[in-house]
């Protein structure tokens, strides 16, 4: 009976240790992912860099099976979705990454690839602390 109790206790300890390990791994991965996005914050970057970050965010949303709303934009799922918006000097409205993808990355590259932009805002999901939103402005 003591062996049985010790076995159960050992199994419980293994489960707890594995859970803590998984949590630490997840936290480390969030840090790595966030660092990539945060490297753009308050820095001047070219339109070609915007293309790279849009592609990364789009790939992440697809990998995480983020739904697309009726307006054609990804829906915030409160966990791991990400949105990017860009404000151009000559336009009154903000353009979403989905719109740029729909019009064509190549067209964006040829028209805006050499222009400078600055990430002026980053927001995070409350529960997971992952980057959920980035706002770039043409400078």
Q: Where are the regions that the model predicts?
A:
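N-terminal export/assembly leader peptides and their processing motifs that target proteins to secretory
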Residues: 14-139
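Hydrophobic membrane-insertion alpha-helices, especially the h-region
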Residues: 3-16
């Amino acid at each position: 009976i003591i062996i049985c109790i010790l076995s159960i206790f050992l199994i419980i300890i293994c489960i707890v240790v594995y859970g803590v390990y998984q949590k630490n791994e997840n936290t480390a991965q969030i840090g790595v992912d966030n660092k990539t996005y945060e490297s753009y914050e308050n820095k001047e970057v070219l339109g070609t860099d915007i293309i790279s970050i849009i592609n990364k965010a789009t790939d992440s949303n697809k990998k995480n099976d983020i739904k697309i709303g009726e307006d054609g934009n990804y829906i915030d799922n409160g966990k791991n979705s990400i949105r990017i918006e860009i404000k151009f000097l000559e336009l009154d409205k903000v353009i979403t990454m989905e719109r740029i993808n729909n019009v064509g990355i190549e067209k964006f590259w040829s028209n805006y690839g050499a222009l400078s932009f600055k990430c002026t805002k980053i927001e995070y999901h409350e529960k997971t602390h992952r980057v959920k939103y980035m706002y770039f402005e043409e400078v």
